[in-house]
Amino acid sequence: MTQTLSQLENSGAFIERHIGPDAAQQQEMLNAVGAQSLNALTGQIVPKDIQLATPPQVGAPATEYAALAELKAIASRNKRFTSYIGMGYTAVQLPPVILRNMLENPGWYTAYTPYQPEVSQGRLEALLNFQQVTLDLTGLDMASASLLDEATAAAEAMAMAKRVSKLKNANRFFVASDVHPQTLDVVRTRAETFGFEVIVDDAQKVLDHQDVFGVLLQQVGTTGEIHDYTALISELKSRKIVVSVAADIMALVLLTAPGKQGADIVFGSAQRFGVPMGYGGPHAAFFAAKDEYKRSMPGRIIGVSKDAAGNTALRMAMQTREQHIRREKANSNICTSQVLLANIASLYAVYHGPIGLKRIANRIHRLTDILAAGLQQKGLKLRHAHYFDTLCVEVADKAGVLTRAEAAEINLRSDILNAVGITLDETTTRENVMQLFNVLLGDNHGLDIDTLDKDVAHDSRSIQPAMLRDDEILTHPVFNRYHSETEMMRYMHSLERKDLALNQAMIPLGSCTMKLNAAAEMIPITWPEFAELHPFCPPEQAEGYQQMIAQLADWLVKLTGYDAVCMQPNSGAQGEYAGLLAIRHYHESRNEGHRDICLIPASAHGTNPASAHMAGMQVVVVACDKNGNIDLTDLRAKAEQAGDNLSCIMVTYPSTHGVYEETIREVCEVVHQFGGQVYLDGANMNAQVGITSPGFIGADVSHLNLHKTFCIPHGGGGPGMGPIGVKAHLAPFVPGHSVVQIEGMLTRQGAVSAAPFGSASILPISWMYIRMMGAEGLKKASQVAILNANYIASRLQDAFPVLYTGRDGRVAHECILDIRPLKEETGISELDIAKRLIDYGFHAPTMSFPVAGTLMVEPTESESKVELDRFIDAMLAIRAEIDQVKAGVWPLEDNPLVNAPHIQNELVAEWAHPYSREVAVFPAGVADKYWPTVKRLDDVYGDRNLFCSCVPISEYQ
């Protein structure tokens, strides 16, 4: 039969690229699970009353090439002015070797958070390097492996200061008046829910205020002034006040370390180390503290430990501080951080080394000195005598200066009374400085760069002598070896080879949605039209961004059934926080601010109770019944008991137990009956898109993990995006922004992240995914995700019982394998199975969540039947190995499972095990072998002997 032109054009071609199983494979799997079609399977599994009659209208699919061309046209509407706005954001030069070998490399960007350290040693080493950079530059003892952005880090510093403060009755937090405005905005938002009073004043007046538990200072103020706070910090310390200092990472190359001046906490943005501005993000924040406060720090910390053979190995340390373990008692709700961006910054430091970084910092400062000298020579006045890269220039004709700047396609900071701000960066050249002279002085100024350079080279007083760094930085060999591109390329490749990412195998982590991050989706993030915009540039310069964001928001509104979407939250956990704040402020607007009880099912993600605590709510746990569903009797009792104090419920759908609960609408009705709101966690949205929606179900607000459902890669632990969808009554209460007003969202609420649209530069990934899939493809993706999970469950059921199922014995998009009976019978645990899977070439499923002693498997729609069968065969082979232990063929204390994973060194060492080397490293005929570089980690040793900085190179060899 002759095909039509429309068929030959094949606009839906990408759907077949994204979805792993082809039509024949899908039919084979449908036959295996006893379903006639995808629609029939979906109809059996999803409750009838929440199934959409028609898919959301998000348009027809587009080919990769058509979508790229369409988005390129949108991006071209952005105007790439040279921005000297500063305020924590500058242009950068990302070394091409890092661009090509990391940012554009799926071996780096498709990996998951390194909960399984044996398959994560490469990025763990890069993160340890990031921590070493932080330690060297801040002068403190302990550093984290990144936070979401500088403003979030400031809020975390405030919360940490209260945790460690000895002044238990003090409830006021002092913020110096020259911190960045967006930082103050986020601090105020966080302080409100914690019940702290924020005082903003000149830093030198801090001692005038009573009952202060913590202070936030900024080493280089927002308008450029370098502060020597040594004496002030000493006085504050004598009064037991916890001191936090915000610092500029590039300035720290030249300036004295705040830690050496007595600061307790130092933080800032690592954006200047090679990460483009991207209209606000994503960027990693660095965070450091004194050793005595290490167990109160927020976020991931990488530590040096030992493996089972006694070799040096890296792992995430002190995880008992974190939300996935401590829940509402955690130090923060941080789950996703900014690992990929932290690793870019880390490798930027490795590539340039201390000499290169000093050259860059000195060049920036020299050009700033030259600019200052020329302006002063012509009679203009500077507000500050001491500066690093930022000048605050008083101008009589400010309007004229700004007009000339616009004509020259230059952005200056314009929000300072009777002055403009100018921040230089590593991209600034002498030609740029001459342009600035022309803008500020007119064309006939007669200034000469070389003449000015000679003057300032011999007489620069812009950095106080006491503020100049007098110690060496980055002395570890890793920062002094890889400076040729060949060496750098090989070092990065050596790290990549240690890790297991989606470019090698499926990552079947339940509740994580490790789906394809298509190359066509990733390409636009490197376009300069998206990468080079300052987040506070005039809105008319960002029309492309505004169009793309508006279109993406419209699609998400239709897909979620909500009325509005706020793009600001930088992660899923931050989206939870923002959504709960919207609920809180909604209640307050109705004079019901007393509503502060948040109901959370026992099966919830750890971020849920941690976020509720951050939002100032009390957590009350709702029981689950024997089938894993919310116990409606207990829910009604808890809701009735809460009464007028009920704020909301946080519920995940499908549930974290991997089933579509039949009573989800009744759950919503019960909560609404008692005046509460329904927060539907979007973690499992990949099983909803096109089939049902949170709004249709009856929820009021949800966050969306764009790094799960909508294809932003996990990056080894970030970046992520967690925009929130809300019903109309909550729309006025989503986050706002003090610097940039968000068009279409008329809200005066505080910000939750530094930039108005969060990590805006990765939003094109989700735009591309939705555009290429269209309504038809998005629904099919959800259906195939469900099919793949049911195929795995049906084939493994006899070997590993599926703990929870819904109607007809079906699961949703993931399934929980119950290992507890096997452990009781044989002594082999879920941990042993997880580590043995490494020998078979797989990342482990999620361990012991949401039920201890289980493995939760989520295959996503992107894995083909071939890969699913490979995983299933590995699991069945492992079950056969467990039977060998059960039969006594291998002793419990010495078998391939308890000794897993196995490494290459063992092949040439003495072999005393009762199983062969072949069984150890080539089980079940594994051909395309992934080799872990370390054996099983000793977690206890790592936490008892905490060491979180670089170790000698010899330790890795």
UniProtKB/Swiss-Prot annotation:
Pfam families: GcvP2_C (PF21478), GDC-P (PF02347)
N6-(pyridoxal phosphate)lysine carried by residues: K708
One Gene Ontology CC term in the entry: cytosol
InterPro entries linked: GcvP, GDC-P_C, GDC-P_N, GDC_P, PyrdxlP-dep_Trfase, PyrdxlP-dep_Trfase_major, PyrdxlP-dep_Trfase_small
Substrates-to-products reaction catalysed: N(6)-[(R)-lipoyl]-L-lysyl-[glycine-cleavage complex H protein] + glycine + H(+) = N(6)-[(R)-S(8)-aminomethyldihydrolipoyl]-L-lysyl-[glycine-cleavage complex H protein] + CO2
Keywords: Oxidoreductase, Pyridoxal phosphate
Keyword Iron recorded: no
Top-level enzyme category: oxidoreductase
Entry cofactors: pyridoxal 5'-phosphate
EC number: 1.4.4.2
One GO BP annotation of this record: glycine decarboxylation via glycine cleavage system
Disulfide bonds: none
Signal peptide location: none
GO molecular function: glycine binding; glycine dehydrogenase (decarboxylating) activity; pyridoxal phosphate binding
Keyword NADP belongs to the record: no
Family: Belongs to the GcvP family.
Subunit structure and binding partners: The glycine cleavage system is composed of four proteins: P, T, L and H.
Protein role: The glycine cleavage system catalyzes the degradation of glycine. The P protein binds the alpha-amino group of glycine through its pyridoxal phosphate cofactor; CO(2) is released and the remaining methylamine moiety is then transferred to the lipoamide cofactor of the H protein.
UniProt-recorded name of the protein: Glycine dehydrogenase (decarboxylating)
Source organism per UniProt: Escherichia coli (strain 55989 / EAEC)
High-level lineage: Bacteria, Pseudomonadati, Pseudomonadota, Gammaproteobacteria, Enterobacterales
Gene name of the record: gcvP
